[in-house]
Structure formats: structure tokens, C-alpha cells
Amino acid sequence: MGGAVVDEGPTGIKAPDGGWGWAVLFGCFIITGFSYAFPKAVSVFFKELMHEFGIGYSDTAWISSILLAMLYGTGPLCSVCVNRFGCRPVMLVGGLFASLGMVAASFCRSIIQIYLTTGVITGLGLALNFQPSLIMLNRYFNKRRPIANGLAAAGSPVFLCALSPLGQLLQDHYGWRGGFLILGGLLLNCCVCAALMRPLVAPQVGGGTEPRGPQRPPQRLLDLSVFRDRGFLIYAVAASIMVLGLFVPPVFVVSYAKDMGVPDTKAAFLLTILGFIDIFARPTAGFITGLKKVRPYSVYLFSFAMFFNGFTDLTGSTATDYGGLVVFCIFFGISYGMVGALQFEVLMAIVGTQKFSSAIGLVLLLEAVAVLIGPPSGGKLLDATKVYKYVFILAGAEVLTSSLVLLLGNFFCIGKRKRPEVTEPEEVASEEKLHKPPVDVGVDSREVEHFLKAEPEKNGEVVHTPETSV
């Protein structure tokens, strides 16, 4: 991709794997929690919005849809901003946008205005926080990156369990307008998290001002060269197919229980079970992925997590009572947590640190399309058949397909491809090929010595340096 470029500074910065990285992890935990839980948490205000504006449930549901679409669909824009201005400034602006959108929504007089404020402005603000926080986390952690990603991903279920009751409490005491205003103030904490994202600085030589190591070539604002990487292409296709069905069961499981005659309170408790299991599944999956013997096979572990999730959906379609749905939510929470902990760790392992900011933006854009297709397609299938199990079968089939795409694509297209020829001197030396004569050529050391000493005019000038003299 042509156009403007930005220099990100010196190379050779080693991930500290701790230190200030724990503060970055804490900030990423909070940002991930807000980003994923907020679109679901605002749903507690939907009934009051329906009464206020005289609209239907489908009209209010667009608020969450627009929030998710902005979170996923603005990925490339976030990548450009991060590569141009850096993570911390982008997150500070994003925190202001997220707060401003909710504060402005508290003064809205129509649902369209809420779409623009809560949906577009707050959604954009959360997107400008979510992606840079992941980029900073992956710059601060290398050896401990899997467990760091798992702990950060745990912010989603933790905040979901906290924000939904908080939203209900605010609505009961202050109404939806007061609740939106207070939530807007709460989102200013994103700016605090942005302040924690301290850029890594290259080490200095002898206290001087010159950074150690070579300068990195200027980086494109949006690096489309990732599409030349077969590993990235396979990951992007698999992730897009996965998202078609991944979010469908949590959307429909409560209605599925109510359709069986389960009371509303018990039906809603299913999501609490799912979220509680998810809290522990994510860091556990990150810890397992970080083990030395497991980490080289993280792509296959991610494929297994997707397969596990799809298989759980298929078995959940056979549930006939509340107990069956409880068992489904337990296993779905485990598999869902594994997927959440591994998805960005695997992407980072595929594309590397330098291309991660562009890669994650492009992947989120592709997933945005799938997010807008998946749950609505499940709803249309439900309207046509009136049978919930078909919705779960469709979701399971989509996630299973994505796991097979990743597994087979990685095994046949990546795992078995020939290793490229070694061109770097350091790599050549490690392969013991440096200065190694062909097998069929014999070398007489006496003739070589005579040639160098007696006939220098045929050989050119011989220069002795401390590095070449023995």
C-alpha cells in the first residue's frame, strides 16, 4: 500500500515480560471489559427506552448492533491512527469519545439521536481503546504473552457480571437518562487506562542519545502486505466463519430456556453460569498455552477450542430441560473462554509484533461483517422454523467448519511447506553452511597458501584485520 508512512522508531526493544507491563495488563483488562461487556450491558435500559420513544424491541436492539459494528468495523481506522500517532494518544481520544457519547445520549430526544451518540460515538471511542490496548500488551509481553492475553481477556466476563446489575441499579434510582450520564462518567476511566500505556524506549549506548541497533524502515499506516502471508489468510477466513456462529448461543439460550417453560429468573441465571465459568477459563487457557511444550502448537490448540465450542453447540441442541441447558452453559463457558484467550495470541504468533497493529484491524473488519450476519440469520431461521435447536445446530456447524479450515489449512499449507533458503549470515552460521566448500571440490591448503603469498597480483590486495587474522 502506498501513501504516507510513519517511522515507529528504533528496533531491538526487548519485551520486558513484567515490570510496568503488569500496569499495562491491568489497563488492558479494564478496556477489554468495557469494550465487550458494554454493548450487552446497555440492554438493561431497552424496556425504558421502548416506553420513552414508543418503539419496538428490534429498534432498541440496533443500539447494541451499532456498538459492536463500530468496535469491529473500525479496525483499519484504528490501525492507521496507531501507526500514525501511537497507542497512548489514540486511547486518550477514544476514552473522551466513549464518555462523550453516553453523556450526550442522556439528553437525546429520539432513538435516532441515541443511535448516533451511544452507537456511533461511544462505539468508536471503545474501538479506539480496545485495539491499541491489545497492541501495547503484546509489545510488553513475549514469553508470558499467552497468560497475559488470557488475563486481559478475562475482563470481558468480569465486567459483564458487574455492569449489567449496575445498569439495572442506576435505572431504578436515576432513570435511563441518569444511568447513561453516570455510565458516561465511568467510561472516563478509559483515559486513566490510556495513561498507563507507556511507550517502550530503545536502550541507549553509554548514556548517549543515539539508540542502539539499526533503525526500522518506515512503516505503512495500514500494511496490506499481511494478505501475502498464507498463515494470516487462513486465520482471517477461519475467524470470520467462526464469528458467524460464536455469539449466537449466548443471544438465544435465555429464550431457549423460556420456550421450555423455565421461569425468567432461572433462565437469566444461565448467562451468569456461562460468565462465571468464562472468567476462569480464559486465564487457565492462557497459562496452558504459555507452557514450553504447548506454545509451538498454539494454532492447533486454538483449532481444538473452536471444535470444542462447535461440538458443544451441537450437543446443546439436544437439551430437553433446564439441567441440560446448565450443562451446556458450563461447557460452552469453557470453550468460549478458550477461544477468547487464544484468538489474539495466535494472530500475534502468525504475523509478529511489527505487523500486528495492521493485522488485527483487518481481522476485526472482516469479523464485523460476520457479526452483523450471524445473530440475525439465526433469528430468521428461528422465525421460519419456530424450533430453537436448529439455531444451535447452525451455529455449531459454522464454528466446526472454522476449526477445520484452520486445522487443515495450517497442516497442509503452512506446516508442510519447505523452509525458505537461509540468507542472513547469522542464520547461515547457525546452519553451519558459512564458508563450507562443495562436497565434490577438494581444497589443497598448501596451494592456497602459495597462491596468496607468491601471486598477490592475481588475487588482489590481501588485507589483514584483527577480525580476519588468526
Curated annotation (Swiss-Prot):
Extracellular side: 39-61, 106-109, 171-179, 253-267, 320-321, 377-391
UniProt entry keywords in alphabetical sequence: Cell membrane, Membrane, Phosphoprotein, Symport, Transmembrane, Transmembrane helix, Transport
UniProt xrefs under Gene3D superfamilies: MFS general substrate transporter like domains (1.20.1250.20)
Membrane disposition: Multi-pass membrane protein
Residue span of region Basolateral sorting signal: 429-446, 446-470
Cytoplasmic face residues: 1-17, 83-84, 131-149, 201-231, 289-298, 343-355, 413-470
Positions bearing Phosphothreonine: T465
InterPro entries: MCT, MFS, MFS_dom, MFS_trans_sf, Proton-linked_MCT
Disulphides: none
Gene Ontology molecular function, alphabetical: lactate transmembrane transporter activity; lactate:proton symporter activity; pyruvate transmembrane transporter activity
GO biological process, one term: pyruvate transmembrane transport
Highest taxon of source: Eukaryota
Keyword Cell membrane: yes
Chain ranges passing through the membrane: 18-38, 62-82, 85-105, 110-130, 150-170, 180-200, 232-252, 268-288, 299-319, 322-342, 356-376, 392-412
PTM annotation (Phosphoserine): residues: S430, S469
Disruption phenotype: Deficient mice are born at normal Mendelian ratio, with no apparent defects at birth. However mice exhibit impaired exercise endurance with abnormal neuromuscular junctions innervation and lower compound muscle action potential amplitude.
Self-association and partners: Interacts with BSG; interaction mediates SLC16A3 targeting to the plasma membrane.
Domain notes: Two basolateral sorting signals (BSS) in its C-terminal cytoplasmic tail are required to direct SLC16A3 to the basolateral membrane.
Family: Belongs to the major facilitator superfamily. Monocarboxylate porter (TC 2.A.1.13) family.
Function: Proton-dependent transporter of monocarboxylates such as L-lactate and pyruvate. Plays a predominant role in the L-lactate efflux from highly glycolytic cells.
Name of this chain's protein: Monocarboxylate transporter 4
Organism: Mus musculus
Lineage: Eukaryota, Metazoa, Chordata, Craniata, Vertebrata
Originating gene: Slc16a3
